[in-house]
């Protein structure tokens, strides 16, 4: 009897090209043949055209990346939800003679199947956790602790990296403002930052301008949607964007009256969403989810739809979970919105995963990896859309 291993390779590629990438990840460890096929460029091209997009959640805990499996389907029928932190994606050290040495990750940024990782010792690497492919990015001069990075994609599907680096020496300033849109409000900070673009094809960095700092290095919740990257600006009053096609910054207004906490994307990574809080004397602190709906062609203003998540006030025990550093993703379950949020453990709770829905706050004692102590880095939860996309290699 013919087995799957006996099939011609072209037929196997055709079959696998229709399997969601999230399931292909499980095949990598089953045999060398599967692992080689998953890394193959021919399968990658077919897969991007044929396979449906399925998302999964990842979480960064104690410098390691894990997948998050959740079951929220029965939450409206009094069935207890659960979250498991399961598969550990291992980023290997390329400088070590021992390839089993694992790298500690300080920060991750997702764009269309690739993770841009800043290591604990400030190095930079682009990583596809699904295929295991990596590309270590060398700095123009040296790695710096204060550098911030974002990964994006141009309209011709070329990946680029944006770097924000603080200038120590005022003589380095060149005051180039051509990367700023006319509607962008420049803050009054005296600090100057240089912005550079890394081009994968030429394997090199180039400066695109020096202006006042636009996005706060302490706010690491930037997200990429359709190749454009968004952050809160340093004053947290505007939404800052960077278009990797035009290599220009822009800004969007944010809903008034709320304190803006974190950005995320919808399940398929196609729409921007935001978690915020507002306070009134009568109700106390309330939590809202905002989803970007469209951009006006005339004013280029972004429209938002508001979904109240937690009304009637957040108690003191839970208020600390909705501060800077929180990360989240949102699900739609039976026409209702459920938010899964993540924060560091604190004196009120050792749990880091929480569910907010229908004015209820649910703490989950999840299974799997957990921060080792209260001083561990803040866990980071993000939506990841697996892909077999290959990292562009330059000359």
UniProtKB/Swiss-Prot annotation:
Pfam families: F-box, FBA_1
Top-rank lineage group of the source organism: Eukaryota
Residues of the F-box domain: 1-47
First and last residue of the signal peptide: none
PROSITE patterns the record matches: FBOX
Matching CDD domains: F-box_AtFBW1-like
Cross-referenced InterPro entries: F-box-assoc_dom_typ1 (IPR006527), F-box-assoc_interact_dom (IPR017451), F-box-like_dom_sf (IPR036047), F-box_dom (IPR001810), SCF_F-box_component (IPR050796)
Protein name according to UniProt: Putative F-box protein At3g21170
